[in-house]
Amino acid sequence: MGNKWVTDVTEFALFGIKLYLSPIIDLYNGEVISYNLSRHPNLNQVTDMLEKAFSKIPDNTNLILHSDQGWQYQHKHYQKMLKEKGIRQSMSRKGNCLDNACAENFFSLLKTELLYLQEFTSVEHFISELHEYIEWYNNKRIKLKLNGLSPVEFRQEAA
């Protein structure tokens, strides 16, 4: 696992319902470390996502977690969780989406390869396909910059 992670939130609108996806992505290999899908973009969404990610790493790893300046990333509880785990917080400059381009790129791929290519019969169908997509993205989707390996294969080969 790398020492730089990024996070952000993106919105999906389907069947008159909004869903919000919040992933943590490892910049080392592009792997989605953890994620949370919610009907509301609230603090619990990002703290649950953090707890899932924290279960995969030891304390004090000298990790940096980068985000935009969204309200949830400025919340004291979120910042306290990072500090207690020994993770340094990094935030984009105000109004500069390019600072979080890696997260935005993942969202673009996700929407291009899943959302815009499939017909969904229900919100539940979309949710199921989203979980499958992230599993496929991590374990099967090859990347040229990873020598033709998937993110998980690249991490395992490097270990």
How does the language model describe each region?
Residues 1-159:
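Charged DNA-binding/catalytic regions of mobile-element recombinases
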